[in-house]
């Protein structure tokens, strides 16, 4: 039985195969594993249309086999970035593209879920490629559940330990009728 390869290019050698070459092949596999575990790459995208992230089995350097990917390009239109159907991993992806166009990250074929950076969004997302279906796998945006500095997430029944509110900041009630305003000196005033 011949060697096979994982979706990210690691060679799975059959017992008894490749006599005398295991050292070299194993070292390459370890390098691929390190790249997958924590590698970073800046990936220049096509300025319009699609960019395909591919893997060369048994070799290092494939952009899609890095944990962190930064998309770069001066976009001239909406773009799509695709990965092969058998890739199952998670990524931290930063969209550093300029110009106000969207970037969609998806599997190469199928109608499964994808992740999109809206026009002008240069944020960072944690996404995972599920490979959960042979023809329509999903890519999921794990960051949609995060509370960030710019999000408008509603916190219900949460305890904030030692929150800091800026001078002139306020807490509004749900109906928008009253505010608790914080000033630099003195006590909070209920308005």
Provide a role label for each language-model segment.
Residues 18-19, 84-85, 120, 148, ...:
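A broadly tuned, weak detector of single residues within folded domains
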Residues 79, 87-88, 101-146:
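Beta-strand-rich solenoidal segments
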